Structure formats: C-alpha cells, structure tokens
Amino acid sequence: MSSGGLLLLLGLLTLWAELTPVSGRPGLCELPAETGPCKARIRAFYYNPHSHKCLEFTYGGCKGNANNFKTIDECNRTCVG
C-alpha cells in the first residue's frame, strides 16, 4: 500500500475512534433535566453529561423524561457506573 493510502487509512481510523461512544452509558443519561408541566415540588436527581455527575433538581410530578431518579445512588448506578 502506498504512503498516501496508509495516511488515508490512519485518518479514517482516527475519525472512527473519535466518533465511537466510549461508555456503555444508557441513552436516557444524555437527556436534559425535565421538570415537566405539573406543579409538585419533588426532589429528584438527573445525570448531567457535561459535568459527568448526578445532580439534584425539582421534578414537577408529571411528564418529564427518563433521566429522573428518586435517589442519587440510583442515578449513579445507572449513569456513572
């Protein structure tokens, strides 16, 4: 293989490695915190993919999304590992 072909192959492998997810974290952990439209004030936890931590938020009690955990331990087990 020519040196140009090897460089192209190396570049493609590098791009593939950069775009392939590293963790086995479930997709729900990538969702934003969603309070929902209801007015209850329920203490809940969500995974913040930018800080790589589970954080507290106030859940309204309805709708929202799956990135919503009753305890920080449950959030950590699911999303942090």
Curated annotation (Swiss-Prot):
Domain of life: Eukaryota
Protein location: Secreted
Disulfide-bond pairs as recorded: C29-C79, C38-C62, C54-C75
Signal peptide annotation: 1-24
One of the record's GO molecular function terms: toxin activity
Tissues/organs with expression: Expressed by the venom gland.
Keywords noted in UniProt: Disulfide bond, Protease inhibitor, Secreted, Serine protease inhibitor, Signal, Toxin
Any one annotated GO CC term: extracellular space
Keyword Protein transport included in the entry's annotation: no
Residue stretches making up the BPTI/Kunitz inhibitor domain: 29-79
Similarity comment: family membership: Belongs to the venom Kunitz-type family.
Name of this protein: Protease inhibitor 1
Species in which this protein is naturally found: Walterinnesia aegyptia (Desert black snake)
